[in-house]
Amino acid sequence: MAKASTFTMTSEEQALNDHHLFAQVLREALPYIDFLKEKTLVIKLGGSTLEHQQGILQDILWLQALGAHPVLVHGGGLYINEWLEKLHVPTHFENGLRVTDATTLDVVRMVLLGQVNAGLVLLASQLGGKAIGLSGIDGRMIRARVADESLGLVGEIEAVDPTLVQTLIEQGYIPVVAPLGQSADGSCLNINADLVAAHLAGALHAEKLIFLSNVAGICRTDGSLISELNETEAQQLIEEGVISGGMIPKVSACFDALFAVPNVHILDGREPHVLLRELFTDQGAGTMITRKKPPAA
């Protein structure tokens, strides 16, 4: 029986193949790179993806180097839970929101500002970037009121002043924002980070709002990923129960942003280079939600 033939590329052929692949990738990416120049991108980093922060920050620095203006909003729920347990502070949630008394708020502030925010800024600097950490209290950026007395010091956003963030962007910095706000009487309030990202993206008239979480995006009942849908279609999926559980408040935050932001993306932040694949390839890597289509003429 004849032996099956094998084919092995020479080093020159492999190099030529690599060059062709590089050229193909570059041709595909160039229109997207050109489109995103000088555009603001608000990126929300969920607490469940913080262990992948180095890769995410590297991609964010690439976005800035390519001419985009990234703004990072972060959560920190897992770290907050860890410290509350260490300090023997009881905690519980209602409708997905942490009930926050004064003691809990002290821990929330300590973790968000002293650990997560400061850690992201330090890592960005170590990677060669320039980031500045702040929260919604700085410059009275996020004005809020108590959302529900039963939730304690949990804020509902009333207004966002993007001036401080815009100033940092103009100076070449990457703003890193912790989800805290301030009430009319000066009290600090704990605010859901998805909502902070959505309202800040709207105030900045960002080109895109991107949620990095621990899911690939919105999936059909058979588990297949939906790469794109508009807000009307997303609302229908909520009503049908296809979008359920913790994805509902995230998609609701998307709806909050779509009045001022053309596109909102939900990506799995644990996947390598998911930001670059979503923004610079035709195939994408997650789910994009767009504004509902206008009625036909």
Tell me the role of every PLM-derived stretch.
Residues 276-281:
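C-terminal/domain-terminus segments
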Residues 285-287:
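Charged catalytic cores and adjacent phosphate/nucleic-acid-binding surfaces used
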Residues 1-270, 283, 292-297:
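Nucleotide/pyrophosphate-binding catalytic subdomain
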